[in-house]
From Swiss-Prot:
<comment type="similarity">
    <text>Belongs to the bacterial ribosomal protein bL21 family.</text>
</comment>
<keyword id="KW-0687">Ribonucleoprotein</keyword>
<dbReference type="InterPro" id="IPR018258">
    <property type="entry name" value="Ribosomal_bL21_CS"/>
</dbReference>
<dbReference type="GO" id="GO:0003735">
    <property type="term" value="F:structural constituent of ribosome"/>
</dbReference>
<keyword id="KW-0694">RNA-binding</keyword>
<comment type="subunit">
    <text>Part of the 50S ribosomal subunit. Contacts protein L20.</text>
</comment>
<keyword id="KW-0689">Ribosomal protein</keyword>
<dbReference type="GO" id="GO:0006412">
    <property type="term" value="P:translation"/>
</dbReference>
<dbReference type="GO" id="GO:1990904">
    <property type="term" value="C:ribonucleoprotein complex"/>
</dbReference>
<dbReference type="GO" id="GO:0019843">
    <property type="term" value="F:rRNA binding"/>
</dbReference>
<dbReference type="InterPro" id="IPR036164">
    <property type="entry name" value="bL21-like_sf"/>
</dbReference>
<dbReference type="GO" id="GO:0005840">
    <property type="term" value="C:ribosome"/>
</dbReference>
<dbReference type="Pfam" id="PF00829">
    <property type="entry name" value="Ribosomal_L21p"/>
</dbReference>
<protein>
    <recommendedName>
        <fullName>Large ribosomal subunit protein bL21</fullName>
    </recommendedName>
</protein>
<comment type="function">
    <text>This protein binds to 23S rRNA in the presence of protein L20.</text>
</comment>
<dbReference type="InterPro" id="IPR001787">
    <property type="entry name" value="Ribosomal_bL21"/>
</dbReference>
<dbReference type="InterPro" id="IPR028909">
    <property type="entry name" value="bL21-like"/>
</dbReference>
Length: 103
């Protein structure tokens, strides 16, 4: 069984037992969270697609860790003008362990 969930402005295909990295969620490590924005639920050949959400469907997950992705380096240059700008960014994430999918 799998589900398509929406969190942090992105969509993820998840199944029970998987670990995924999502945009940072304000939750403690070890805390169990319930994601109720489920866009689709599939079980073998059967697929239930919401309009836009599947009513009554939830995904339970446990927060495993918080962290930062690798650094992304931004370099801007204006040719012939002696203008250079360097910038870096590390996006924060939350790692989730998917426990169960209830449809």
């Amino acid at each position: 069984m799998y589900a398509v969930i929406k969190t942090g402005g992105k969509q993820y295909r998840v199944a029970a037992g998987e670990k995924i990295k999502v945009e940072q969620i304000a939750a403690e490590v070890g805390q169990e969270i319930v994601i109720d924005q489920v866009l689709a639920v599939g079980n073998g050949a059967e697929l239930k697609v919401g309009t836009p959400l599947v009513s009554g469907a939830t995904v339970k997950a446990t927060v495993v860790a918080h962290g930062k992705h690798d650094k992304v380096r931004i370099f801007k240059l204006r040719r012939r003008k002696h203008y250079q700008k360097r910038q870096g960014h590390r996006q924060q994430f939350t790692e989730l362990q998917i426990q169960a999918i209830a449809a």
